[in-house]
Amino acid sequence: MNLAQDPSEADGPTFSRRFVRSVTLVSGAGQVADFVLPLFAGAVLGLTAAQAGALLAVGLATSFLLRPLGGVAADRYERTTIAAASALVLGAGYVLVAATATFPVVLAGVLVSRAGGAFLWVALRATAGARHQVDPRAFARLMSAEELGAWVVLAPAIALLAAAGYAPTFAAAAACTLIAGVLLASSRRRASTRGSGDVDAARADPLVEARGAVVRGLAARLRPLLAVVTVIGTAEAAVGLLLVLHLQRELGLEPLAIAWVSLPGGIALAVAPPHLHRLTVRYGRTPVLVAAAIAGAAFAGGLALARDPMTIAVLWILSALALAAILPIEQAALTEAAGPARIGRALGLYEATTLLAAALGSLAAGILYDAVPWAAACATSAAVILVGGLLLPQVIRQLAPMQAVG
């Protein structure tokens, strides 16, 4: 899968190979940390479930608060420089976790890594947002590079965890981020992605920024889209966690077996975005979004009837295809609505919104799993996904130029 057909220029119509590889490495490292940290908290630190949850919540809160600031930075400063420095900070956080089994140091590592990740991902998405003006495939390509990390980095890391333990696994994640930082820095020397460049966002008037009127207006303009993103993201996160709980507690699968069940969906999520973008170009956003909403709802509803891991794996592919269609369209619509001078701020708000949705979805999943039958929990998630997905085209149509909606 060649995501970067132009091997040299990061600011041309496509991303450079160095940029793509760095995205894959940092994405895979982040997925490793997300998978391993809860296990590490219980097995090595001896934390209770509530304490482990609090540790994760503090990290997520840090990321949530810093992502809008990352958007401000991405609009004012060199985005590749921000991404490279943030990748190094992310790696430093993983090094702290790998180096010791004492809670204060691990907490510091979690906070440092979440801070680095907040600035990193906003800068990377803002780079894609700037590319979107000359290459509408930019967000689909970025998503493919991200999801490639799930089976290029995460799958070997699970094997490393089983063979060598937690510290080497976190060290490997740190190595991935440090290599990514070097790749980003080297691509910065070869091709600038400056916020005030021809392709990237222009800098805003500092006097206007000081008043904050434009930022507040941007938030108000994007509020309907961000609200729908929150609804869909909450339902998707809820059904994802519900499924993991079901596989673990009802079907008795171990973490490695759960990873194998999710692998076909992960591969689909990495491969599908550019192909689904072609369908979006051919048929328009509205038909693709409606089809994706139906596919996502079919995944959630079908889980109520699925009784074996093979069927669940097939259904997981439906969910992956839905996300591969919806997420690049959401990000592209947000970029178009924000305008070139506010790409970073808009995507900072978007990143914070998706993080909030993930937190709400996790909370909802826990409540649904304990309070209602499995079939009712799946049906509830399916209904929310379908309604949110059907609302999304109308919300996007109100934001974007008519020719971009289709």
Positions of PLM-derived features:
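Juxtamembrane intracellular "pre-TM" segments in multi-pass secondary transporters
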Residues: 2-14, 187-227
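Helix-loop boundary and gating motifs at the non-cytosolic
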Residues: 10-60, 221-228, 232-261
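Residue-level signature of mid-helix packing/kink "hotspots" within the transmembrane helices
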Residues: 60-68, 150-151, 266-274, 358-359
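Helix-to-loop junctions at the C-terminal end of transmembrane segments
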Residues: 66-78, 161, 272-285, 369
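Structural signature of the two symmetry-related core transmembrane helices
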Residues: 81-95, 287-301
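Cytoplasmic helix-loop-helix junction between adjacent transmembrane helices
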Residues: 111-146
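Symmetry-related core transmembrane helices of the 12-TM Major Facilitator Superfamily/SLC fold
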Residues: 169-185, 378-393
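A late C-terminal transmembrane helix in Major Facilitator Superfamily
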Residues: 342-370
